[in-house]
Design a protein with these regions (language model features):
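Class I S-adenosyl-L-methionine
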Residues: 1-124
């Protein structure tokens, strides 16, 4: 699946969805891309890098949605003891596009990543 969540989110934005509820399961893309000399001592531990990549992925997804006019929240929807994949991205259209392009680009440059959702939203 990998980037399936990104395609679903981009499609929801293109369709003008008023509310988006997404439980992302696909966060491998950034794990493969993430490179940063300053973070090398942390990224050398595969498990840590994988978990950080998953969190960065969903945080960037939420911020990209805010740039499209959605107010977003990232929530736990089920107790951690049941599943570690318990993040819900809730996005509600309010039309106020957050001017966060510069900040997001700085983060993506720092991590040497280009999320699929960013590319898909640029196309639309």
């Amino acid at each position: 699946c990998d980037t399936a969540t990104d395609y679903a989110l981009a499609k929801a934005v293109r369709w003008g969805a008023r509310v988006i509820l997404s439980v992302p399961c696909c966060q491998h893309e950034l794990n493969r891309q993430m490179k940063n000399e300053q973070m090398k001592p942390v990224f050398q531990y595969g498990l840590i890098k994988e978990r950080m990549a998953a969190l960065y992925t969903d945080a960037l997804r939420a911020q990209l949605l805010e740039g499209q006019g959605y107010r977003t929240q990232i929530l736990e929807f089920i107790d951690m003891e049941h599943t570690p994949k318990n993040i819900l991205i809730r996005a509600v259209w309010d039309g106020r596009k957050k001017q966060n392009e510069k900040e997001l680009q700085e983060i993506m440059d720092f991590l040497s990543v280009k999320p699929t959702l960013a590319a898909l939203l640029e196309e639309s």
